[in-house]
Amino acid sequence: MYKLLIINP
């Protein structure tokens, strides 16, 4: 889930 946040800086 938080991986999506890594994609969105």
Curated annotation (Swiss-Prot):
| Primary site of residence | cytoplasm
Localization: Cytoplasm
Kindly list the GO CC terms recorded for this protein: cytoplasm
Q: Name one GO molecular function term.
A: ATP binding
Q: What class of enzyme is it?
A: transferase
Which Gene Ontology BP annotations are present? butyrate metabolic process
Keywords in UniProt for this one? ATP-binding, Cytoplasm, Kinase, Nucleotide-binding, Transferase
Give the reactions, separated by semicolons, that this protein catalyses: butanoate + ATP = butanoyl phosphate + ADP
- Family recorded in the similarity comment: Belongs to the acetokinase family.
Q: What is this protein called?
A: Butyrate kinase
Q: Which organism is it from?
A: Clostridium pasteurianum
Q: Which gene encodes it?
A: buk
